[in-house]
């Protein structure tokens, strides 16, 4: 995620979090990069197409995993959800990782979830070895 954000800077990167769910905790096994398909405002927005989701989901299932969330970068902005992120992001239970990329270098990385549709809460996500 960090390298992907640095590579696409000053545009936002995006991708899928693949893993499993143990109780209320998402366990991250793999990261699956996606192409930001947004045509304009790529510095502050990203777009994952349904076709990209289908491919990532099929890949995850072939490995006994599922799509447990998404990630994207915030070029020259904090690793915290924006109002736009709140309105256009994940479903309850999914993880939403944001990596800050400052002047082309990866900085903070935080994971969030939305227990309901009204706000984000920072979460810990387990990373499988």
Q: Where are the predicted features?
A:
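Conserved, mostly hydrophobic/aromatic
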Residues: 70
């Amino acid at each position: 995620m960090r390298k992907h954000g640095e590579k696409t800077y000053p545009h936002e990167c995006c991708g899928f979090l693949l893993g499993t769910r143990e109780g209320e905790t998402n366990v991250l096994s793999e990261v699956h990069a996606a192409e930001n398909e947004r045509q304009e405002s790529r510095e502050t927005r990203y777009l994952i197409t349904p076709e990209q989701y289908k491919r990532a989901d099929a890949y995850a299932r072939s490995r006994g995993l599922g799509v447990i969330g998404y990630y994207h970068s915030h070029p020259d902005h904090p690793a915290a959800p924006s109002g736009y992120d709140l309105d256009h992001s994940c479903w309850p239970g999914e993880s939403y990782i944001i990596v800050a990329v400052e002047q082309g270098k990866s900085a903070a990385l935080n994971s969030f979830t939305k227990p309901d549709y009204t706000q984000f809460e920072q979460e810990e996500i387990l990373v499988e070895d």
